[in-house]
């Protein structure tokens, strides 16, 4: 009896200690899509941090309190990499129904903060049947429309004229990890004229790191891209095809620069207009061609010169052939890029700082590509983003002395 009495205080002490022990917070369980509300929360691909499933389409609808805007921050992203994000990707939209697309993301690049124009945002992830990764994880939060801080930018512009600029302009450099989207909307019978007054964005030959992209219409759509810009030379004035333009600015997590300030104004449609030539040219896509006896019996010789073939080609590059595989009379090659002079719709694969493309030589020995050799290659682009090399395509050995005339051609207006 005495022993039992002595146990009572000890048992109470142990029970109290167990109750006082801090509880380990539960890890969120991520499912395919859902309705998310409140001031803040988490969003992630199905099964994160495990591999996301193939052949899936997941949609999350986020709503924060009225009078606030949604701010989305990606903490981690690992999806199948593709230059055009055609296979596995995450789309982010303003609103819930038929909203403007703010951005499309894939690979492992983590974009900056994404800000909706209102209190609703839609996130959609699509995966195909092939390569997968760990997916993504992001946080969303509510912010005051006019108190989002220096890291936030973008918005809907509907006044007859106005200005847009990078965060911190002109006091200091723009910050790292920023994504800004300005959606300019004019009345139906008007167009939009765009001019950059000052421009200084981290320089790169292919504008891979920090860049400004301008699109006809109200969403990020490579088929409607007017140009992609970086460096310290302001783009030439731009005139929209219709009454909407979208401007996207993105900075990565390394170097920054002064940034830019630009102005826009509406103008009547009746004025004669010419849309500026894109920096990254989008040309008509050619259909896939199969080798035929007649086609492959053509004389195998290149036609014309560097100059005469440059503008008629969808893409122009110098590169090293790293792999070749023969399939059904055609040669499929992977080419590591030395320099690219004209990109068109060519799908460029990137691994670190190395870039490569897939090419199909329709008639496998005409023209002849050998592994380990460097070539200047001009050709067309198929619907799959591969380069198409025909018997009369311009292909020649690339030597260092070719660099100067090729750079001169790169500045040529076609």
Swiss-Prot record:
GO molecular function, one term: heparin binding
Residues annotated as transmembrane: none
Signal peptide region: 1-22
Keywords, comma-separated and alphabetical: Disulfide bond, Glycoprotein, Heparin-binding, Repeat, Secreted, Signal
Predominant location category: secreted
Domain CUB: 32-143, 153-267
UniProt cross-references to Pfam families, sorted A to Z: CUB, NTR
Disulphide bond pairs: 32-58, 85-106, 153-180, 207-230, 296-363, 300-366, 311-414
Start and end residues of each NTR domain: 296-414
A single cellular component GO annotation: collagen-containing extracellular matrix
Record localization: Secreted
Any one Gene Ontology BP term: cellular response to leukemia inhibitory factor
Function of the protein: Binds to the C-terminal propeptide of types I and II procollagens and may enhance the cleavage of that propeptide by BMP1.
Assembly mode: Interacts with heparin with high affinity, and type I or II collagen.
Protein's name in the database: Procollagen C-endopeptidase enhancer 2
């Amino acid at each position: 009896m005495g022993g039992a009495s002595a146990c009572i205080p000890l048992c109470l002490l142990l029970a109290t200690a167990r109750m006082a022990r801090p509880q380990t917070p539960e890890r969120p369980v991520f499912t395919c899509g859902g309705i998310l509300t409140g001031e803040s929360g988490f969003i992630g691909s199905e099964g994160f941090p495990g591999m996301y499933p193939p052949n899936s389409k997941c949609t999350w609808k986020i709503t924060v309190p009225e009078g606030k805007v949604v701010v989305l921050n990606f903490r981690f992203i690992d999806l199948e990499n593709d230059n055009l994000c055609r296979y596995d990707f995450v789309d982010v939209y303003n609103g819930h129904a038929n909203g403007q697309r703010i951005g499309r993301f894939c690979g492992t690049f983590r974009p900056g903060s994404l800000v909706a124009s209102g209190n609703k945002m839609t996130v959609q992830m699509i995966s195909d049947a092939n390569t997968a990764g760990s997916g993504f994880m992001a946080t969303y939060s509510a912010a005051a429309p006019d108190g989002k801080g220096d890291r936030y930018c973008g918005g809907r512009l509907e006044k007859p004229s106005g200005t847009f600029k990078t965060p911190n302009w002109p006091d200091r450099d723009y910050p790292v990890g920023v994504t800004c989207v300005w959606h300019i909307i004019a009345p139906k019978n008007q167009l939009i004229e765009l001019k950059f007054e000052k421009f200084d964005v981290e320089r790169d030959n292919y504008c891979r790191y920090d860049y400004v992209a301008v699109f006809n219409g109200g969403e990020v759509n490579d088929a409607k891209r007017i140009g992609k810009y970086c460096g310290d030379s302001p783009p030439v004035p731009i005139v929209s095809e219709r009454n909407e333009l979208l401007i996207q600015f993105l900075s990565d997590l390394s170097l920054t620069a002064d940034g830019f300030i630009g102005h826009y104004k509406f103008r009547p449609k009746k004025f004669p207009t010419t849309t500026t030539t894109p920096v990254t040219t989008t040309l008509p896509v050619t259909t896939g061609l199969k080798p035929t006896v007649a086609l492959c019996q053509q004389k195998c010789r290149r036609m014309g010169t560097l100059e005469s073939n440059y503008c008629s080609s969808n893409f122009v590059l110098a590169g090293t052939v790293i792999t070749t595989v023969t399939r059904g009379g055609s040669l499929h090659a992977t080419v590591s890029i030395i320099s690219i002079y004209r990109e068109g719709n060519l799908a460029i694969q990137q691994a670190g700082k190395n870039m490569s493309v897939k090419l199909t030589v329709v008639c496998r020995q005409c023209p002849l590509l050998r592994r380990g050799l460097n070539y200047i290659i001009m050709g067309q682009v198929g619907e799959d983003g591969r380069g198409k090399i025909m018997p009369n395509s311009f292909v020649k050995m690339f030597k260092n002395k070719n660099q100067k005339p090729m750079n001169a051609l790169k500045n040529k207006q076609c």
